Amino acid sequence: MLPEISVSAQAENSGVSEGSHSYTTPVMNTATKLPLSIRETPQSVTVITRQRVEDQNLVTINDVMQNTPGIAITASGPQRDRFNARGFSIDNITFDGLPISLGQYGGDALLADMAIYDRIEIVRGAAGLTQGAGNPSAAINLVRKRPTRDPYLSVDGYAGNWDRYGLTA
C-alpha cells in the first residue's frame, strides 16, 4: 500500500489591481512573458492601475496615454489618434497579451471606455524578442478585469466638459 501524500499550492498572483487601492501591481508580464515585479523587469515599463485610473478620472485610453511618460499622441482624424514613442508609431498593442491588428485607419478598438480594464501595461523600447516583429517604440498591453470570487456590482457615472458624460455598470 502506498503512503498518503499531501499536495498543496498557492494561486498564482495575477497582478489584479482593482480593489487594491495601489498605484502599482505585484506582477506584470508584458515585457518578458514571465510574472515579474516592475522592479525585476529589465526594461522601461509603466503600469497604470485601476486606482490611478479612478483617482485621475482617466475615462479613455487616450487619457491614459496622455498621462504616460514618453508617449506622444498625434491626431490622424476625428477620434482617431496614433500613439508614438521614441520617434516611432506604436503598432504593438495587445489585449490580455494577445495581439490585435489596428488596421489602416487607426484603432476603433482603442475607443473603448476604461471601465473594462484592470490596468494598462506599457513597455518602452524594442519588444520584438517577446512580442514578435515590430519597431523600437513601445508595446501596450490592455489587461481586462477578471471575475471575482464573490458577486460584485458597481455603477459609476461621470460628466464633464466637451460633451463628456457616461454611465458604466
Language-model features: locations:
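Acidic, small-polar-rich N-terminal luminal/periplasmic segments of exported/outer-membrane proteins
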Residues: 3-150
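Short strand-turn segments of transmembrane beta-barrel domains in outer membranes
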Residues: 143-169
